[in-house]
């Protein structure tokens, strides 16, 4: 009865007629979350949160557990698909002015922050070489927090160094945070249904609407089919393409690779952090690389909502996308010239976008006034 009620309410939901394919990523993210929770549940049955057994338990899952290789690869590749979808979702919201729905936008950024924390804790669990070093570096950044830094680092690590209690804590957090992501997603959807969705033209969405089913259902199903096809293709043929070779070795505190490289979806923030030759400054820049998204509703100055009819703002937007890709690339390189210089310049350009974004709006408003 409840399911029928939900399906009926979703099917009859009034939706703007002119939303494009870029609006499909919300439903794709819901499917990604469901896949991650389902595969994570089966993996947790066989995983052992112990520094001497964690790496071996992953090997056991892949080699001995029936379809364990599929669960492990779906979970790992699914995380990458999840972040690819959420970054596109955020970029769409940025381009089409969805951030003007302040509550919906803020809840979305909270989901992104929680998701990044979940992914970080999950990356540590295999206890490979890169997992161990990532845990060491990131937990050490907490020491930069005034007054509470040392206490928080000791509490999260479960001691004065990364050890068995750290892995147990990370496993517990990795299990509980998806529930928080699900709860925040529910709030995000409720707020979205309260305000309605934006549209490519930035016009009043209440002027022209149609019911969600069947017009938008089939459009969503097409994109979901493409998503699942890509996910299964990568899982079946090139499952290790996104994995770091260092992480195929068991963690050894006495061995340090040439440079530390997290998963690709953290690389842009990591590049910003390491471009500043100061621990406190790097930690602050790392946090601000995401937190600065909260400022967008406050700095919107244009009379037009979207960037569809704003060429100058479009130029800034695509500069931001290029900067994001450049930061991702530089983070894969060693900390040496010229890569450090490029990452510093790209970091400056990244934050400059948010400072300069109000300027085109002010110029447009001035030039569009009637004589």
Curated annotation (Swiss-Prot):
Binds 2 heme b groups non-covalently. Keywords: Electron transport, Heme, Iron, Membrane, Metal-binding, Mitochondrion, Mitochondrion inner membrane, Respiratory chain, Transmembrane, Transmembrane helix, Transport, Ubiquinone. It is found in: Mitochondrion inner membrane. The chain crosses the membrane at residues 25-45, 69-90, 105-125, 170-190, 218-238, 280-300, 312-332, 339-358. GO terms for cellular component: mitochondrial inner membrane; respiratory chain complex III. Pfam families: Cytochrom_B_C, Cytochrome_B. Its cofactor is heme b. Heme b b562 binds at residues 75, 174. GO terms for molecular function: metal ion binding; ubiquinol-cytochrome-c reductase activity. Gene3D superfamilies: Cytochrome Bc1 Complex, Chain C (1.20.810.10). A ubiquinone binds at residue 193. The cytochrome bc1 complex contains 3 respiratory subunits (MT-CYB, CYC1 and UQCRFS1), 2 core proteins (UQCRC1 and UQCRC2) and probably 6 low-molecular weight proteins. Belongs to the cytochrome b family. This is Cytochrome b.
């Amino acid at each position: 009865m409840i399911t029928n009620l939900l399906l009926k309410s979703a099917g009859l939901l009034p939706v703007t007629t002119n939303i494009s394919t870029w609006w499909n990523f919300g439903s794709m993210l819901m499917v990604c979350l469901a896949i991650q929770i389902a595969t994570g549940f089966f993996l947790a049955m066989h995983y052992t949160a112990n520094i001497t057994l964690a790496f071996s338990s992953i090997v056991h899952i892949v080699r001995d557990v029936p379809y364990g290789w599929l669960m492990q690869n779906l979970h790992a590749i699914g995380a990458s698909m999840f972040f690819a979808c959420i970054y596109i979702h955020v970029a769409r919201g940025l381009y089409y002015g969805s951030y003007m729905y302040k509550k919906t936008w803020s809840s979305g950024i909270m989901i992104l922050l929680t998701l990044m924390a979940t992914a970080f804790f999950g990356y540590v669990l295999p206890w490979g070489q890169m997992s161990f070093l990532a845990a060491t570096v990131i937990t050490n950044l907490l020491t930069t927090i005034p007054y509470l830094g040392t206490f928080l680092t000791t509490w999260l690590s479960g001691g004065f160094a990364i050890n068995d209690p750290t892995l147990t804590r990370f496993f517990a957090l990795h299990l509980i945070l998806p529930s928080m992501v699900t709860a925040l997603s529910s709030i995000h959807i409720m707020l979205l249904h309260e305000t309605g969705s934006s549209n490519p033209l930035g016009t009043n969405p209440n002027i022209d609407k149609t019911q969600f089913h069947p017009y938008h259902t089939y459009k969503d199903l097409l994109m979901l089919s493409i998503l699942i096809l890509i996910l299964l293709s990568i899982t079946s043929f090139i499952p290790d393409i996104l994995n770091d070779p260092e992480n195929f070795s068991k963690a050894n505190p006495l061995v340090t690779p040439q440079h530390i490289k997290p998963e690709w979806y953290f690389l842009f923030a990591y590049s910003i952090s390491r471009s500043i030759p100061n621990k406190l400054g790097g930690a602050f820049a790392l946090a601000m690389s995401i937190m600065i998204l909260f400022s967008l509703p406050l700095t919107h100055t244009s009379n037009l909502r979207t960037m569809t009819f704003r060429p100058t703002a479009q130029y800034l937007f695509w500069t931001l996308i290029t900067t994001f890709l450049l930061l991702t690339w530089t983070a894969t390189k060693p900390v040496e010239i010229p890569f450090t210089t490029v990452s510093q310049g790209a970091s400056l350009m990244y934050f400059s976008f948010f400072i300069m974004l109000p300027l085109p709006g002010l110029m447009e408003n001035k030039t569009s006034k009637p004589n």
